[in-house]
Amino acid sequence: MKREGVSAFIVPSTDPHAGEYIPERWKARRWISGFTGSAGTAVVTLKEAALWTDSRYFIQAAKQLEGTEFVLMKEKVEGTPTIAEWLGSVLPQESVVAIDGWVNTASEVESMEISLKSHNLQLRTDLDPFAEIWEDRPSVPKGKAFIQGLEYAGE
């Protein structure tokens, strides 16, 4: 991150297709934090790390993050900062926060840009540090695409 001029990296629980069940290759949040729940976002700075998840996973996350550098952030609990608020409090102004733009929708990127900008932070969308640091990262799935029959389509 330091070499790239990045002060923080946000790691969501998504893949390039915004699928509900994501292939192993894109489970970077699980790999970096150890948290295996299906919903959560990890944020890693040069000095600190935190994981946001919802109430379904508070107990699981607390157990799995125990003994790690990650602090559990309980989403939508009074007093818990948003990711942008937290980053605004731990990073110098004008710091660069990065994401892998391939695993975020355009509306997510726009929302992140707005919230980070309100804390005087910049967003970079072209970084995938896991390509370099996750040595045994699973490969891209090689299954063939196929057309679903109309009988499976909604109205």
Regions picked out by a protein language model, each given a short descriptive name:
Residues 1-92, 96, 100, 104-155:
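N-terminal accessory/capping or targeting/presequence segment of soluble
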